[in-house]
Protein backbone atom coordinates (compact mmCIF):
# COMPACT_ATOMS: atom_id res chain seq x y z
CA UNK A 1 0.00 0.00 0.00
CA UNK A 2 2.80 2.39 0.94
CA UNK A 3 4.55 1.76 -2.39
CA UNK A 4 1.29 2.35 -4.28
CA UNK A 5 0.69 5.64 -2.45
CA UNK A 6 4.26 6.72 -3.23
CA UNK A 7 3.70 5.90 -6.90
CA UNK A 8 0.48 7.95 -7.03
CA UNK A 9 2.21 10.89 -5.35
CA UNK A 10 5.03 10.65 -7.90
CA UNK A 11 2.58 10.57 -10.83
CA UNK A 12 0.61 13.56 -9.53
CA UNK A 13 3.79 15.54 -8.99
CA UNK A 14 4.90 14.84 -12.55
CA UNK A 15 1.48 15.81 -13.90
CA UNK A 16 1.70 19.11 -12.02
CA UNK A 17 5.14 19.80 -13.49
CA UNK A 18 3.83 18.95 -16.97
CA UNK A 19 1.04 21.48 -16.54
CA UNK A 20 3.45 24.20 -15.49
CA UNK A 21 5.19 23.79 -18.86
CA UNK A 22 2.03 24.90 -20.67
CA UNK A 23 2.52 28.52 -21.72
CA UNK A 24 -0.04 30.62 -23.57
CA UNK A 25 0.62 33.80 -25.54
CA UNK A 26 -1.75 36.73 -25.99
CA UNK A 27 -0.25 39.66 -27.90
CA UNK A 28 -0.94 42.46 -30.35
CA UNK A 29 2.16 41.54 -32.39
CA UNK A 30 0.24 40.31 -35.46
CA UNK A 31 1.71 37.73 -37.84
CA UNK A 32 3.67 39.97 -40.22
CA UNK A 33 6.76 40.63 -38.12
CA UNK A 34 9.27 38.35 -36.44
CA UNK A 35 8.11 39.13 -32.89
CA UNK A 36 5.99 36.00 -32.33
CA UNK A 37 8.67 33.72 -33.75
CA UNK A 38 11.35 35.32 -31.59
CA UNK A 39 9.18 35.00 -28.48
CA UNK A 40 8.52 31.31 -29.10
CA UNK A 41 12.17 30.65 -29.92
CA UNK A 42 13.26 32.25 -26.66
CA UNK A 43 10.74 30.19 -24.69
CA UNK A 44 11.86 26.92 -26.30
CA UNK A 45 15.50 27.82 -25.62
CA UNK A 46 14.79 28.56 -21.95
CA UNK A 47 12.18 25.81 -21.46
CA UNK A 48 12.84 22.95 -23.93
CA UNK A 49 9.79 20.99 -22.73
CA UNK A 50 7.44 23.96 -23.06
CA UNK A 51 4.09 23.47 -24.75
CA UNK A 52 3.16 26.83 -26.24
CA UNK A 53 -0.43 27.73 -27.11
CA UNK A 54 -1.40 30.85 -29.04
CA UNK A 55 -4.53 32.50 -27.64
CA UNK A 56 -4.30 35.37 -30.14
CA UNK A 57 -1.72 37.62 -31.75
CA UNK A 58 -4.39 39.74 -33.44
CA UNK A 59 -5.44 41.76 -30.39
CA UNK A 60 -6.14 45.34 -31.43
CA UNK A 61 -3.01 47.41 -30.85
CA UNK A 62 -2.55 48.29 -27.15
CA UNK A 63 -6.09 47.09 -26.28
CA UNK A 64 -5.83 45.49 -22.87
CA UNK A 65 -9.64 45.44 -22.75
CA UNK A 66 -9.69 43.10 -25.74
CA UNK A 67 -6.85 41.02 -24.32
CA UNK A 68 -8.70 40.63 -21.02
CA UNK A 69 -11.87 39.53 -22.81
CA UNK A 70 -10.04 36.93 -24.92
CA UNK A 71 -8.16 35.50 -21.95
CA UNK A 72 -11.38 35.36 -19.94
CA UNK A 73 -12.80 33.13 -22.64
CA UNK A 74 -9.79 30.82 -22.85
CA UNK A 75 -8.02 30.48 -19.51
CA UNK A 76 -10.73 28.45 -17.74
CA UNK A 77 -10.12 25.52 -20.10
CA UNK A 78 -6.44 25.20 -19.16
CA UNK A 79 -5.20 23.06 -16.26
CA UNK A 80 -3.83 24.43 -13.02
CA UNK A 81 -0.23 25.54 -13.31
CA UNK A 82 -0.62 27.00 -16.80
CA UNK A 83 1.42 30.16 -17.42
CA UNK A 84 -0.18 32.94 -19.47
CA UNK A 85 2.07 35.62 -21.00
CA UNK A 86 0.12 38.78 -21.77
CA UNK A 87 2.13 40.81 -24.30
CA UNK A 88 -0.23 43.72 -25.01
CA UNK A 89 0.83 47.26 -24.03
CA UNK A 90 3.66 45.64 -22.10
CA UNK A 91 6.24 48.45 -22.00
CA UNK A 92 7.87 48.97 -18.61
CA UNK A 93 9.21 52.09 -16.91
CA UNK A 94 10.38 53.32 -13.53
CA UNK A 95 6.73 53.85 -12.61
CA UNK A 96 5.35 50.72 -14.26
CA UNK A 97 6.71 47.30 -13.37
CA UNK A 98 6.08 43.71 -14.42
CA UNK A 99 3.44 41.85 -12.42
CA UNK A 100 2.55 38.24 -11.73
CA UNK A 101 -1.10 37.42 -11.11
CA UNK A 102 -1.87 34.10 -9.42
CA UNK A 103 -5.53 33.36 -10.04
CA UNK A 104 -7.50 30.12 -9.83
CA UNK A 105 -4.30 28.08 -9.80
CA UNK A 106 -2.84 29.70 -12.92
CA UNK A 107 -0.15 32.33 -13.54
CA UNK A 108 -0.49 35.52 -15.59
CA UNK A 109 2.54 37.67 -16.46
CA UNK A 110 1.69 41.23 -17.48
CA UNK A 111 2.85 44.81 -17.19
CA UNK A 112 1.09 47.04 -14.67
CA UNK A 113 -1.25 48.38 -17.34
CA UNK A 114 -4.74 47.77 -15.94
CA UNK A 115 -5.12 44.24 -17.31
CA UNK A 116 -5.43 42.59 -13.90
CA UNK A 117 -8.46 44.61 -12.79
CA UNK A 118 -10.14 44.11 -16.17
CA UNK A 119 -9.47 40.38 -16.14
CA UNK A 120 -10.41 39.51 -12.55
CA UNK A 121 -13.15 42.11 -12.00
CA UNK A 122 -11.52 42.45 -8.56
CA UNK A 123 -12.83 39.03 -7.51
CA UNK A 124 -11.49 37.46 -4.35
CA UNK A 125 -8.62 35.03 -4.57
CA UNK A 126 -6.41 37.06 -6.91
CA UNK A 127 -2.81 37.35 -5.69
CA UNK A 128 -0.64 40.00 -7.35
CA UNK A 129 3.15 40.28 -7.08
CA UNK A 130 5.49 43.01 -8.28
CA UNK A 131 8.33 41.08 -9.89
CA UNK A 132 11.93 41.82 -8.98
CA UNK A 133 13.82 42.97 -12.09
CA UNK A 134 17.35 44.36 -12.00
CA UNK A 135 16.62 46.60 -14.98
CA UNK A 136 13.26 47.37 -16.60
CA UNK A 137 14.75 48.86 -19.75
CA UNK A 138 14.06 46.91 -22.94
CA UNK A 139 12.52 47.68 -26.31
CA UNK A 140 10.99 44.15 -26.24
CA UNK A 141 10.09 43.52 -22.57
CA UNK A 142 7.90 40.49 -23.25
CA UNK A 143 10.90 38.74 -24.79
CA UNK A 144 13.45 40.08 -22.32
CA UNK A 145 11.59 39.60 -19.03
CA UNK A 146 8.32 37.64 -19.28
CA UNK A 147 10.03 34.60 -20.80
CA UNK A 148 12.54 34.43 -17.93
CA UNK A 149 9.79 34.66 -15.32
CA UNK A 150 8.05 31.78 -17.11
CA UNK A 151 11.31 29.83 -17.00
CA UNK A 152 11.68 30.30 -13.25
CA UNK A 153 8.07 29.24 -12.66
CA UNK A 154 8.68 26.09 -14.71
CA UNK A 155 11.77 25.40 -12.63
CA UNK A 156 9.60 25.43 -9.52
CA UNK A 157 10.75 28.75 -8.08
CA UNK A 158 8.27 29.83 -5.36
CA UNK A 159 6.22 32.89 -6.23
CA UNK A 160 7.43 34.63 -3.07
CA UNK A 161 11.00 34.39 -4.38
CA UNK A 162 10.07 36.18 -7.61
CA UNK A 163 8.60 39.35 -6.15
CA UNK A 164 6.62 41.01 -3.40
CA UNK A 165 2.84 41.19 -2.84
CA UNK A 166 1.42 44.25 -4.57
CA UNK A 167 -1.97 45.94 -4.25
CA UNK A 168 -1.34 49.26 -6.00
CA UNK A 169 -1.68 47.99 -9.55
CA UNK A 170 -3.45 50.17 -12.10
CA UNK A 171 -7.23 50.02 -11.97
CA UNK A 172 -9.29 50.53 -15.14
CA UNK A 173 -13.08 50.23 -15.13
CA UNK A 174 -13.79 49.68 -18.86
CA UNK A 175 -15.56 46.39 -18.13
CA UNK A 176 -17.96 47.87 -15.59
CA UNK A 177 -21.29 49.24 -16.89
CA UNK A 178 -22.99 52.14 -15.12
CA UNK A 179 -26.36 51.27 -13.59
CA UNK A 180 -29.10 53.87 -13.14
CA UNK A 181 -32.77 53.60 -12.13
CA UNK A 182 -34.12 53.30 -15.67
CA UNK A 183 -30.98 52.56 -17.66
CA UNK A 184 -27.80 50.51 -17.96
CA UNK A 185 -24.95 52.24 -19.79
CA UNK A 186 -22.24 50.00 -21.17
CA UNK A 187 -19.88 49.90 -24.10
CA UNK A 188 -18.61 47.71 -26.93
CA UNK A 189 -15.57 45.77 -25.71
CA UNK A 190 -14.94 43.39 -28.63
CA UNK A 191 -15.87 42.68 -32.24
CA UNK A 192 -15.39 39.03 -33.16
CA UNK A 193 -14.28 37.25 -36.33
CA UNK A 194 -17.84 37.26 -37.69
CA UNK A 195 -18.36 40.97 -37.04
CA UNK A 196 -20.61 40.35 -34.03
CA UNK A 197 -20.50 43.16 -31.47
CA UNK A 198 -19.88 42.24 -27.81
CA UNK A 199 -20.89 44.56 -24.97
CA UNK A 200 -19.72 44.59 -21.35
CA UNK A 201 -23.28 43.99 -20.11
CA UNK A 202 -23.73 40.48 -18.72
CA UNK A 203 -26.84 38.34 -18.59
CA UNK A 204 -26.63 38.30 -14.78
CA UNK A 205 -26.55 42.10 -14.56
CA UNK A 206 -29.42 42.51 -17.01
CA UNK A 207 -31.60 40.00 -15.16
CA UNK A 208 -30.83 41.65 -11.83
CA UNK A 209 -31.71 45.15 -13.04
CA UNK A 210 -34.61 44.30 -15.35
CA UNK A 211 -36.71 42.68 -12.61
CA UNK A 212 -39.16 41.49 -15.25
CA UNK A 213 -39.31 44.83 -17.08
CA UNK A 214 -39.12 45.11 -20.84
CA UNK A 215 -36.50 47.34 -22.43
CA UNK A 216 -35.02 48.88 -25.56
CA UNK A 217 -31.40 48.07 -26.44
CA UNK A 218 -29.18 50.50 -28.34
CA UNK A 219 -25.84 49.58 -29.89
CA UNK A 220 -24.79 53.07 -30.92
CA UNK A 221 -27.67 54.07 -33.25
CA UNK A 222 -28.98 50.56 -33.95
CA UNK A 223 -31.85 49.58 -31.66
CA UNK A 224 -33.75 46.43 -30.74
CA UNK A 225 -37.00 47.64 -29.21
CA UNK A 226 -39.40 46.19 -26.65
CA UNK A 227 -37.38 43.14 -25.66
CA UNK A 228 -37.11 41.04 -22.50
CA UNK A 229 -34.37 38.90 -21.00
CA UNK A 230 -36.24 35.72 -21.91
CA UNK A 231 -36.47 36.79 -25.57
CA UNK A 232 -32.72 37.21 -25.98
CA UNK A 233 -31.17 34.23 -27.76
CA UNK A 234 -28.72 31.88 -26.08
CA UNK A 235 -27.71 30.24 -29.39
CA UNK A 236 -26.98 31.79 -32.77
CA UNK A 237 -29.52 29.54 -34.51
CA UNK A 238 -32.24 30.51 -32.04
CA UNK A 239 -33.14 33.83 -33.68
CA UNK A 240 -36.73 34.97 -34.04
CA UNK A 241 -38.89 33.68 -36.86
CA UNK A 242 -38.99 36.09 -39.76
CA UNK A 243 -35.37 37.17 -39.54
CA UNK A 244 -33.41 36.70 -42.73
CA UNK A 245 -29.69 36.78 -43.54
CA UNK A 246 -28.36 40.21 -42.67
CA UNK A 247 -30.89 41.01 -39.92
CA UNK A 248 -29.55 41.88 -36.44
CA UNK A 249 -30.60 40.06 -33.28
CA UNK A 250 -29.52 39.91 -29.62
CA UNK A 251 -27.76 36.95 -28.06
CA UNK A 252 -26.02 36.12 -24.79
CA UNK A 253 -22.71 34.75 -26.03
CA UNK A 254 -20.61 31.90 -24.66
CA UNK A 255 -19.27 34.13 -21.87
CA UNK A 256 -22.79 35.42 -21.10
CA UNK A 257 -22.15 38.93 -22.44
CA UNK A 258 -24.90 40.68 -24.39
CA UNK A 259 -24.03 40.68 -28.07
CA UNK A 260 -25.59 42.04 -31.24
CA UNK A 261 -25.21 39.51 -34.03
CA UNK A 262 -26.16 39.36 -37.68
CA UNK A 263 -27.86 36.27 -39.08
CA UNK A 264 -25.33 34.34 -41.20
CA UNK A 265 -22.83 37.18 -40.76
CA UNK A 266 -19.86 37.17 -43.14
CA UNK A 267 -17.71 40.31 -43.21
CA UNK A 268 -16.51 39.33 -46.71
CA UNK A 269 -20.03 39.45 -48.18
CA UNK A 270 -22.81 41.58 -46.71
CA UNK A 271 -20.88 42.14 -43.48
CA UNK A 272 -21.35 41.70 -39.75
CA UNK A 273 -22.95 43.94 -37.17
CA UNK A 274 -19.86 46.10 -36.83
CA UNK A 275 -19.37 46.90 -40.52
CA UNK A 276 -23.06 47.19 -41.44
CA UNK A 277 -23.85 49.55 -38.58
CA UNK A 278 -20.57 51.41 -38.30
CA UNK A 279 -20.01 50.19 -34.73
CA UNK A 280 -16.55 50.30 -33.16
CA UNK A 281 -14.97 49.15 -29.90
CA UNK A 282 -15.68 51.77 -27.26
CA UNK A 283 -19.05 52.81 -28.70
CA UNK A 284 -21.94 53.16 -26.27
CA UNK A 285 -24.37 50.34 -25.53
CA UNK A 286 -27.41 51.33 -23.52
CA UNK A 287 -30.48 49.58 -22.19
CA UNK A 288 -33.51 51.74 -21.42
CA UNK A 289 -36.19 50.09 -19.30
CA UNK A 290 -39.76 50.71 -20.39
Model-derived regions: residue spans:
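N-terminal glycine-/serine-/threonine-rich phosphate-binding loop
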Residues: 17-95
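Active-site histidine-anchored catalytic micro-motif
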Residues: 22, 46-49, 66, 79-80, ...
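Fold-independent oxyanion-binding glycine-rich loops
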Residues: 27-29, 55, 87-90, 103-104, ...
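Anionic-ligand-binding alpha/beta catalytic cores of soluble enzymes and soluble regulatory domains
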Residues: 137-210
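A conserved acidic, glycine/proline-rich C-terminal tail/linker
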Residues: 200-278
Amino acid sequence: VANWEFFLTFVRANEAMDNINIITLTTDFGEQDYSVGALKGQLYSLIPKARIVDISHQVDRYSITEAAYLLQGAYRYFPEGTIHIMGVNNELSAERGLLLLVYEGQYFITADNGFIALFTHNKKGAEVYLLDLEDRRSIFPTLAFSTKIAQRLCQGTPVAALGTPYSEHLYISNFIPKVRAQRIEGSVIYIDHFGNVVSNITEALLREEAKGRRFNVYFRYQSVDNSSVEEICTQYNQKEDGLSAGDPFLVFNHLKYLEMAIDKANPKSFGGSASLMGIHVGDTVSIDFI
